Amino acid sequence: MLEFYKEPGITPLEFINTIKKQYTDKKICYTARLDPMARGIIPVLFGDECKNMHLYTNLSKTYEVKVMIGYKTDSDDVLGILENSQNKNTITLDDIVLNYKSYFEVENEITITQKYHYFSTKALLARSKNKNNTNEDYTHDVKLFSSKIIDSGELDFKEWIDECITIIDKVDKTKDFRQKEIIEQWHKIKNTNINMKIHYITLQLHVGSGFFVRQYIRDISDTIGIPLMCYDIHRTSISF
């Protein structure tokens, strides 16, 4: 087993195909996939190791997640259609850090019942078979070992959107991730917000197998009534 690093804007299929080109004489498989906009460590198995892939599917993982305040999309990251937004002057970092800190920080291990994210593979497959299925139909219990705020701050809004567009533009154009519509959306918002800053907090999450980071942020957003979305989901380690 070797650990490889996936960059943001790369789909899981593109990632594994790149590895296969480097090891043309070996059977290859991977586990612990990452969403296109996420980055970080992915374990890759070779040859007979693939027979033991099940041994690598229930591992705990650590993420650092930059959560943007005031915007929310249907995908809960920047590769999504905006559901709602709120002027940054009505939401401050003090609101989040002082008034809502308890929603973001967990010191002791808990089990939560979590929906499968709307854009998760299982939910997508279910809807392809039955359009009446929603992510509400699928839940599972997952472990959250700890969650804490490790950073907070603000970014220049236009520079941040430019970074978002650059990453979105890398996503496989042979697949329909709604890239054109989403990029046009961010361009429009960029041009209507002059001299604006956007606030963020960075969470460090230590979680169990099957934990949906984007769903976790959506659930917090729904609970506190403040638009939130993931910008940078970075898997920093896997506990082997």
Feature names for model-found ranges:
Residues 1-240:
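Catalytic/RNA-binding core of pseudouridine synthases
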